A protein has these predicted regions:
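A sequence-composition feature that detects small, non-aromatic residues
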Residues: 31-32, 44, 54-58, 65-74, ...
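Long, well-structured alpha-helical subdomains associated
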Residues: 132-251, 256, 260-274, 278, ...
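Beta/coil-rich, acidic/histidine-enriched accessory regions frequently appended to metallopeptidases
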Residues: 231-377, 382-394, 399-400, 404
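Glutamate identity and glutamate-enriched acidic tracts
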Residues: 18, 27-29, 41, 93, ...
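Catalytic cores of extracellular degradative/oxidative enzymes
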Residues: 2-200, 215
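Residue-identity detector for glutamine
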Residues: 3-5, 28, 88-90, 105, ...
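Phenylalanine-focused residue identity feature
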Residues: 8, 42, 51, 77, ...
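Ser/Thr/Asn(+Pro)-rich, low-complexity disordered segments
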Residues: 4-62, 218, 230, 245, ...
Length: 406
């Protein structure tokens, strides 16, 4: 742990070193690397603080800037890892967790996830410290990506022609990685929630403990290696890995996340240049693989660890503007049944749900297909979605859909 001495003057050294060890232990525990710790092979992680560089991770060490926290290079990370300093600001916990996550994310990472799959570790570090809440976009945002118009996982934030809805060819380069509001071509705030949902269901509420560890362990075997030169194939391989680790058919979950929408070949710039393609045949093979598992996963694409509260800023513990009125993890944990009739009204494109607190989500179904989902009692469906003739269903924690009264 290499620091400028100014960072240690106020609190001393011991607590900062202990916290650094905590961060390493927690992340290696999550990634199932802790079982190899006695070899020393995975114990060489270092931290460096400089006054000139921003935060980054490379070659088994991470860097945090020691500059003014109000400037780009000092953003949120001027601390000595002493909890009395570090825990005053969630960024001070999140940043090291994020950069260390780059060291540990290999088994769950492919181009389009590099700046989001590591945030599973960021959120885990924050959870273990226990003062702040998790980050990431809302389920309403996911619905917009999924249905307005239907967009594949790898292209959630990519620009489209407003008339044809065709994707505009990206002209991003390695020197222009934040164009279109993207970072390295990905919707990191949204993408990070996928793994957070898996962790929340399998680990936090204990439905299938050690599933996340199995995902990492399997991801380090030839059967589930993610091909670095074929991100489309890696995307679907990851879905298979999760299904095998959970011993569940994960079709519904990954469908909600846009994994099963074909992707016409495009060039993705994400720490390199990659051709990203997902064909219908690749999708069909993955769907066939899912059928091997007789148990269907509950609708955990709706699970949340944040309750909705308007105006809740700063990733507060358990509440967020990005949270939901329904779908909180306790509903899944207790396998709550819907015992009250759920009703709704529609005004234009605004839906208002009454007596729906026992549900985990609400779905609009048209011609037998889901065309929208929400986890709020009041939600607006975009013009891009044809709601004529659609009916609203309340989703129970076990996956049963119950038609609501209009």
């Amino acid at each position: 742990l290499l620091q400028n001495q100014d960072n240690f003057k106020h609190y001393g050294v011991v607590k900062g070193i202990e916290r650094w060890d905590n961060l390493i232990d927690w992340e290696q525990e999550l990634a199932a690397i802790d079982t190899y710790s006695n070899t020393g092979e995975f114990n060489s992680l270092m931290h460096v603080t400089t006054f000139t560089d921003g935060l980054y991770a490379t070659n088994y060490y991470i860097n945090m800037a020691a500059g003014d926290v109000s400037t780009k290079d000092g953003w949120g990370f001027k601390n000595n890892f002493d909890p009395r300093d570090m825990d005053q600001n969630q960024d001070n916990e999140w940043g090291p967790g994020h950069e260390l996550g780059h060291m540990h994310q290999g088994a769950i990472n492919w181009p389009s996830t590099t700046e989001s799959s590591n945030n599973l570790f960021s959120n885990y570090v924050v959870y273990k410290i226990g003062k702040w809440g998790s980050r990431g976009s809302s389920i309403g945002t996911l619905a917009a990506y999924r249905y307005a118009p239907p967009t594949p996982w790898s292209r959630f934030m990519h620009p489209r022609d407003p008339n044809t809805l065709e994707f505009i060819p990206q002209d991003m380069t390695s020197d222009d990685a934040n164009k279109y509001g993207l970072y390295q071509g990905e919707a990191s705030e949204m993408h990070m929630r996928l793994n957070q949902q898996l962790w929340t269901y399998f680990e936090r509420i204990g439905k299938k403990p050690n599933t996340i560890r199995k995902i990492f362990e399997q991801g380090r075997t030839p059967e589930f290696w993610l091909p670095s030169n074929d991100p489309g194939a890696a995307q679907l391989m990851y879905a298979r890995n999760v299904a095998k680790a959970a011993d569940m058919d994960m079709t519904e979950f990954f469908d909600a996340w846009g994994f099963f929408i074909p992707v016409s070949s495009f060039k993705l710039y994400a720490y390199g240049s990659f051709s990203y393609t997902v064909t219908q045949d690749m999708i069909n093979q993955t769907l066939d693989y899912m059928k091997k598992f007789p148990t269907k996963c509950p609708p955990i694409e709706y699970i949340e660890d944040r309750r909705y509260q308007a105006g809740a800023k700063g990733n507060q513990k358990g509440i967020s503007e990005d949270g939901g009125d329904v779908g909180y993890f306790e509903t899944f944990q207790n396998n709550v049944k819907i015992t009250k009739p759920v009703s709704y009204t529609v005004s234009g494109r605004e839906y208002t749900v009454t007596d729906g607190e026992q549900a985990v989500a609400f779905e609009l179904i048209k011609d037998g297909k889901r065309i929208w989902f929400a986890n709020r009692f009041v939600f607006i469906v975009p013009e891009a979605v044809d709601i004529k003739g659609a009916e609203l269903y309340a989703v129970q924690a076990d996956g049963q859909r119950i038609k609501a009264n209009k």
